[in-house]
């Protein structure tokens, strides 16, 4: 049986940890002047993926 392919886009965006699958929030790259300080602060920490989306990401990352 051939090796399964890892989805490279998903590999760059998600990291599997003991607590779940970690990812960075979106809309934090550029043009941040219109965003409030509170909003930027809330987007700062990494987030854990919701349970309903874990199965899809795990399929894309077979060796994670």
From Swiss-Prot:
The superkingdom listed in its UniProt entry is Bacteria
Task: Give any single GO term for biological process.
Answer: translation
Alphabetically, the GO molecular function entries are: structural constituent of ribosome
Give the keywords, sorted. Ribonucleoprotein, Ribosomal protein
* Keyword set includes Coiled coil: no
Annotated Gene Ontology cellular component terms: cytosolic large ribosomal subunit
Query: So what family is this one in?
Result: Belongs to the bacterial ribosomal protein bL35 family.
Q: What is this protein called?
A: Large ribosomal subunit protein bL35
What organism does the record attribute this protein to?
Answer: Vibrio campbellii (strain ATCC BAA-1116)
Gene that this polypeptide is encoded by: rpmI
